[in-house]
């Protein structure tokens, strides 16, 4: 597709079935079909491969709106793509995928891991295929699995070898291609490409990639075009940087080749270890692909190198869930540095909510899926967003004293948790507050910075005074919450902040706003959202905020609390923006029942997505978790969103058949030795495939380079190559020392 922009209108045209099709703006209610001569068709296809073409798409206005809904759930309807015995996309359930870590040449071990994944319910199984020999052995693995009655679709994971891809496609249901590694030359050079050089390199890619496309089409095998943030080609990086724009363009280049060959069984992935980059890349891909490509192709979602334990689950849930909440995603993989079987239940826990919401909207099979999506987008009109979907910028807000810590402005988001003991049990409540604030810890330790205490009526005020007096200087860390409007004036002189809970269907007492002033505690208006629409909390809070602003009040915060605050808080941010109001927003998530894993996943999605969007000046969780775990969850969410670093960040891959050391054991050992280095980012990679590239997002890297061998990196630069694995950890620590990043553990 080519776009042209004139002063009065914009149009696009593309070649389809030997016709020259002009797409006019919505004001033009027709398509013009003009027969295309061979020269024009060849010329346009050549243009479509050039970087100049890509830039014209960008400047012509294709990227105007993010086409996904952000205030309610509606799934993006995509073309259904075959995966052997199943399909994905369309209105079908969101599928869960995993990947074995056994070497593909080890038939028995590979079959055993596939069997265990099958028994765990895994719907798609991926295997790494680094060489032609590995590709040939897929036949043996497949045959044994089918003899055992296991018909789970298999995916061949290809990075560098076109020959391996040509063989592997014969034995799998899907083949994954990494555009950054496939048919590319040297990596991480600083070469600047001229337009002619760029076009020539892209022509080479087309020449090497087209045979695979034709073979996959003839065999009925689908293809995932999977870009990784850490392994973009030099050609792409030279023009777009190591960025979401580069990730998207890399994938679209390969997709255009597929479409030119009449091959439409495609899907995309845009993976990164940086959750924000991953979210931005998928959103940008959807905006561009739905505008430029023939079909709306399915998406495979995942955060690569997410790590292990709670951190890995939180990062995966946040990145995947943020996109699922926007209606994007047809299959997912949770990449954990653990046994692959552990990924499966986490994946199903993430997609359950969305699969449960899946509604059949009628048979529209007679219409191309893209037409359905375009119709919905046009009928919906322009939707204002309170955030930048393709880049990060924090929502502007004023800075206030929010109870002993700054809230809003440029301040790092604070952490608040709620005490569960009642005010009537003063001794237990005091003990719980001290356990949460943990004043004996170092100043920068992970602990709750604020604790909220509930007060139900005027009779509780004397108990509150006694409690606050017993806390001494810590009283400024106490947030008092109440739903009783009448006692707010009495509470304001006592503590650092008062939170007034606004209950649906109830009215605020008269005279409250007139009684407020900035000399007392800050006040937070918190809407308890239960049954009303997503618009109601924002409407109520913005009306209140406008009145407070008119009175000149500064020490004001706003929030919405529920077990699903994402859509309503986005709406609040939008309405505040439209009204020119810049009070800080607290991100609140409350869920006091359910299993730990569900609470962890949903809080990461609901709260974490808002911080990735740049919305939120404080995080406050109320859960059934133990206090220490709840506090850790708050900090883990902020760190995964890259909004506040509170400990060492480990970027560790899940391993695959390319890995020649014990990744889980090694990761645990490295964590044990360096986890006290707050804010430092350390990459632990099984092999070179994503390793050096993802080092761009890490300060130091530990990357497998062969059997018993490891290479060490500073950023993307390899500084020690092929050193013995037994020496690697100590040499990594020494490298950290040499670069002035080491401090002795306390």
UniProtKB/Swiss-Prot annotation:
Which domain of life does the protein's organism represent? Answer: Bacteria
What Pfam families does the annotation carry? GcpE
Alphabetized UniProt keyword annotations:
4Fe-4S, Iron, Iron-sulfur, Isoprene biosynthesis, Metal-binding, Oxidoreductase
- Enzyme Commission number: 1.17.7.3
Q: How is the cofactor bound, as the UniProt entry phrases it?
A: Binds 1 [4Fe-4S] cluster.
An example Gene Ontology biological process: terpenoid biosynthetic process
Catalytic reaction list: (2E)-4-hydroxy-3-methylbut-2-enyl diphosphate + oxidized [flavodoxin] + H2O + 2 H(+) = 2-C-methyl-D-erythritol 2,4-cyclic diphosphate + reduced [flavodoxin]
Q: In which pathway does it act?
A: Isoprenoid biosynthesis; isopentenyl diphosphate biosynthesis via DXP pathway; isopentenyl diphosphate from 1-deoxy-D-xylulose 5-phosphate: step 5/6
* GO molecular function annotations of the record: 4 iron, 4 sulfur cluster binding; 4-hydroxy-3-methylbut-2-en-1-yl diphosphate synthase activity (ferredoxin); 4-hydroxy-3-methylbut-2-enyl-diphosphate synthase activity (flavodoxin); iron ion binding
For the ligand ([4Fe-4S] cluster), the binding residues are 653, 656, 687, 694
Which cofactor is recorded for it? Answer: [4Fe-4S] cluster
Q: Which family does it belong to?
A: Belongs to the IspG family.
Q: What does this protein do?
A: Converts 2C-methyl-D-erythritol 2,4-cyclodiphosphate (ME-2,4cPP) into 1-hydroxy-2-methyl-2-(E)-butenyl 4-diphosphate.
Q: What is this protein called?
A: 4-hydroxy-3-methylbut-2-en-1-yl diphosphate synthase (flavodoxin)
State the organism of origin: Chlorobaculum tepidum (strain ATCC 49652 / DSM 12025 / NBRC 103806 / TLS) (Chlorobium tepidum)
Which gene underlies this protein? Answer: ispG
